[in-house]
Amino acid sequence: MRQNKWKFLMFFILLLLDSNLLLAGGVTPSGKNQQKQKVVKNKKEQVDGGIFQAPLYGKTINVIGDSYVKNHRRPYEEAWHYLVAGKYKMNYRNYGRNGRCLVFDRTSEKWGKPMLEYYREMNDTADYVLVIGGHNDADFIARGKGTLLQFEVGLDSLCRGLIAKYPSAKLAFVTPWRVPGQAFEAVTSVIKKVCGNYSIPVFDASSSSGIYVWDETFRKLYFQGPNDMAHLNAKGHQLFFRKGEIFLLGL
């Protein structure tokens, strides 16, 4: 009986010593959790602070284009450009239409007028203007309905018009993916050439996107259909998101 009392007394003394050591170090049992929570909160504040300080934060972006912008049969809220805008709390305007060309008028085919004309209808105020197109122009040329020279002349007019409409905005273009079809490579080359003449940055999605349009297995995973060579699904947009984000941050 006396031995049990001594054991209890020793346990009580050790418990008091342990508590005093914790208090001397400025930590309580609940303080351990509080310290962890503070570290996590500080990390979140650092992340948020980085977003607040980013050049995109709170700015207005007009995105004009074809189904790469409209996002075809899926909501445009899944598109990489919308996701980037959301991350940086941007005012996002989507001016995408399925089937639209940069230069060629497809009104007779029920796909509407080109960006060369439609850009005038966009809101006049924007900090960023992102143009995504060329896929339908390449198809139009491949079908013999337009020429590469017409495309170049029209694109030159579009660039001059955008600069006049948005003299203070940051302009940029994104080319089509590397589609294994006639005229796509030539159209991409013209986009880079004409935009280069006006010092407008271009993201060459045919060479730097990491989007392997020609691979059937890849398309099954990241496109809206196994035979689709234009439209990313939600996973595809997530895959491309970081590259698009870096491009916009660097404008």
Residue ranges of predicted features:
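N-terminal-biased segments
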Residues: 29-48, 135-158
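Catalytic His-Asp segment of secreted/periplasmic serine-dependent ester chemistry enzymes
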Residues: 108, 178-251
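Conserved beta-strand segments of alpha/beta enzyme cores
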Residues: 91-93, 170, 199-201
